[in-house]
UniProtKB/Swiss-Prot annotation:
<dbReference type="GO" id="GO:0003677">
    <property type="term" value="F:DNA binding"/>
</dbReference>
<dbReference type="InterPro" id="IPR026562">
    <property type="entry name" value="Transcrip_reg_TACO1_YeeN"/>
</dbReference>
<dbReference type="InterPro" id="IPR048300">
    <property type="entry name" value="TACO1_YebC-like_2nd/3rd_dom"/>
</dbReference>
<dbReference type="InterPro" id="IPR029072">
    <property type="entry name" value="YebC-like"/>
</dbReference>
<dbReference type="InterPro" id="IPR049083">
    <property type="entry name" value="TACO1_YebC_N"/>
</dbReference>
<dbReference type="GO" id="GO:0005829">
    <property type="term" value="C:cytosol"/>
</dbReference>
<keyword id="KW-0963">Cytoplasm</keyword>
<dbReference type="InterPro" id="IPR017856">
    <property type="entry name" value="Integrase-like_N"/>
</dbReference>
<keyword id="KW-0805">Transcription regulation</keyword>
<keyword id="KW-0804">Transcription</keyword>
<protein>
    <recommendedName>
        <fullName>Probable transcriptional regulatory protein YeeN</fullName>
    </recommendedName>
</protein>
<comment type="similarity">
    <text>Belongs to the TACO1 family. YeeN subfamily.</text>
</comment>
<dbReference type="Pfam" id="PF20772">
    <property type="entry name" value="TACO1_YebC_N"/>
</dbReference>
<dbReference type="InterPro" id="IPR002876">
    <property type="entry name" value="Transcrip_reg_TACO1-like"/>
</dbReference>
<dbReference type="GO" id="GO:0006355">
    <property type="term" value="P:regulation of DNA-templated transcription"/>
</dbReference>
<dbReference type="InterPro" id="IPR026564">
    <property type="entry name" value="Transcrip_reg_TACO1-like_dom3"/>
</dbReference>
<dbReference type="Pfam" id="PF01709">
    <property type="entry name" value="Transcrip_reg"/>
</dbReference>
């Protein structure tokens, strides 16, 4: 899974570079999680998980606090999750996950992006069956065998544990991500660089320079949309 890990890192690094976009999108996600439950991370596990991910992305405390305070203050916006799937050139596939207060606006924007950027939007499920919903946990370390034993003892459903460039990279069944994190914390591991649910392509394609330019434009436009939280694809050389 080394290539998959490299793609996740590349995507995360690219998105982290656009700091204002990252902060705004985490602000929305934190607000939505706080509104759906208690605005206290100690009693709202979904909110706690989002805050942990925001800290991994170096979102400042004041951005996190502002989103929680907005939820506490009775903000009346309601956000709905969505997923849009489609195709780029030569077997390329893309999934955009959204969080929006205006579904009609989001649908219109996503359709426009696909139409203008050389893609074709598909029906629900058109490409997601070619991706595996996977828990990904990353932290500094060099002994994957020891980590695998910890997870095995905790009965975590693990797909793979590898060492990549001084990092332990764990892939779990999506339903066992939080169980895996808890097992690692119980073993004394508390600093994580990534704890995410990722849609990982079962197989990847490589695009020609011309097709890659088109596909990159599609992915960039989707990621730039304010309502899009995450974008997944199956292109190995992007």
């Amino acid at each position: 899974m080394g290539r998959k890990w490299a793609n996740i890192v590349a995507k995360k690094t690219a998105k982290d570079g656009a700091t204002s976009k990252v902060y705004a999108k985490f602000g929305v996600e934190i607000y939505a999680a706080a509104k759906q439950g208690e605005p206290d991370p100690e009693s709202n596990s979904a909110l706690k998980f989002v805050i942990e991910r925001a800290k991994q992305a170096q979102v400042p405390k004041h951005v996190i606090d502002k989103a929680i305070d907005k939820a506490k203050g009775g903000g009346d916006e309601t956000f709905v999750q969505g997923r849009y799937e489609g195709f780029g050139p030569n077997g390329s596939m893309v999934i955009a996950e959204t969080l929006t207060s205006n579904v009609n606006r989001t649908i219109a924007n996503i359709r426009t992006i696909f139409n203008k950027k050389g893609g074709n939007i598909g029906a629900a499920g058109a490409v997601s069956y070619m991706f595996d919903n996977t828990g990904v946990i990353v932290f500094k370390g060099t002994d994957p065998d020891h980590i695998f034993e910890i997870l095995l003892d905790a009965e975590v459903d693990v797909r793979d544990v590898t060492e990549e460039e001084g990092n332990i990279v764990i892939y779990t069944e999506a339903t066992d991500l939080h169980k895996g994190i808890a097992a690692l914390k119980a073993a004394g591991i508390t600093e994580f660089s990534t704890t995410e649910l990722e849609m990982i392509a079962q197989s990847e394609v490589e695009l020609s320079p011309e097709d890659l330019e088109i596909f990159e434009g599609l992915v960039d436009a989707l990621e730039d949309d304010d309502d899009v939280q995450k974008v997944y694809h199956n292109v190995a050389n992007l």
